[in-house]
Every structure is written in C-alpha cells, then in structure tokens.
C-alpha cells in the first residue's frame, strides 16, 4: 500500500485531486479509470453534511450513517439531482480527523487503511466516482468522502436543467470549481437524524 502515484493533472479543488489519486492508482493496478460524476460528487458532499461535524459518528462504537432513503429524499433535491437518475452506490470511503491534510495524504493515510479499503478501491463493479471535502465551523474537523457507483456516464446523477444547486460550504469533484480555502469553510448545515449502523474505525473505508 506504500507505492501510490499522484502524477496526474488536477485542479485546485482537493476533491478533484482525490479523484485523480483514485484513478491513478486504479490504472496502475490495471483497472479502468472511473468517470468523475459531479452529481454523484455533490451527493458525497451532502453525505458529509449529514454528519453535522461529528467525527465520532464516523467510526467506532458510536458509528452511524445516514439512511439510504436520504439519498433520494434529501441529498438529491439539495443538489438539484433528478431522483429518477440515481443509480446504485457500489462503494464508499469516509474519513474524518481534526487536522487538515492534502488530498494525496488523505487518500493514503485516512481512506486507504486496510485490505477492505483496497478491495473497494479496485472493485470492477464501479464505473463512476464522486468525491467531496469539507471542514466544520471554519476549520476542524475535516471530512473526506468518496462515493462509487455502477451508473452510466452522463446519464446518471443528472442535474435538473444541467445545472447544480449551490452547496457551499465544501468542495466536490467534477464541478470545475476552485476550492482551496479549506480553513475558511463555514459551519456544516444540519440535516436529518441518523440510522445507527456499525462502520469500520474512524478514517477507514467502509462498504455498503
């Protein structure tokens, strides 16, 4: 797990850099690169916001996650994604810590921590990916989220009218947006209550 490649051309958006790291390591492993779907990435940002800045809910004995129904009922409308274009989520990474680190380090040190993480990363079930990064209350804690799907490029997770709704604070991939001011992000907004679910320890990847 120590030989990662971070050599691709990316933007100043840390979520784009996270997707670049994922695709570079998939292709180095002889797996196909994934389509960076901004609609799916926006859902990843909404997924983060559902945690309301609570790192303790990401892993450990108090681990929780949003209910699956929230994708169609809350995440998609908040992003302006058509519910009829949602596709199956085939894998997820979620990490949180108090110190901000850049995307390559977040990928290798927080999201890729065990064999299950690698199984998700290299899965042949994925065709699309979307990543999001955000901080809380102008700073710590910081969240990184990646969602994978088996949807069809340019037809799944489509925005109403082809335009995404504003979703600040935070950054998501594929949005052609510069988002380098991680330490200036304002407080994460409140969303619905969680359905309890056991996850892998904080910062680890977790499957469906």
What is the role of each PLM region?
Residues 202-208:
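C-terminal membrane-anchoring or membrane-association module
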């Amino acid at each position: 797990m120590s030989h990662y490649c971070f050599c691709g051309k990316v933007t100043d958006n840390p979520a784009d850099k996270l997707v670049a790291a994922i695709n570079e390591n998939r292709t180095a492993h002889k797996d196909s690169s994934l389509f960076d779907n901004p609609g799916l990435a926006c859902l990843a940002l909404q997924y983060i916001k559902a945690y309301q800045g609570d790192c303790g809910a990401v892993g450990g004995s108090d681990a929780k996650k949003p209910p699956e129904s929230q994708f169609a009922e809350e995440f998609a409308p908040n992003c302006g994604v058509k519910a009829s274009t949602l596709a199956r989520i085939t894998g997820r990474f979620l990490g949180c810590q108090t110190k901000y680190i850049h995307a390559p380090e977040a990928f290798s040190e927080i999201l890729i921590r065990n064999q299950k993480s690698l199984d998700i990363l290299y899965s042949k079930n994925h065709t699309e990916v979307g990543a999001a990064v955000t901080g809380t209350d102008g700073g710590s804690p910081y969240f990184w989220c990646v969602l994978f799907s088996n949807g069809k490029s340019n037809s799944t997770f489509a925005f109403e009218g082809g335009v995404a709704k504003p979703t600040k604070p935070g950054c998501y991939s594929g949005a052609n947006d510069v988002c380098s001011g991680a330490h200036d992000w304002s407080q994460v907004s409140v969303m619905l209550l969680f359905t309890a679910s056991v996850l892998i320890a904080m910062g680890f990847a977790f499957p469906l």
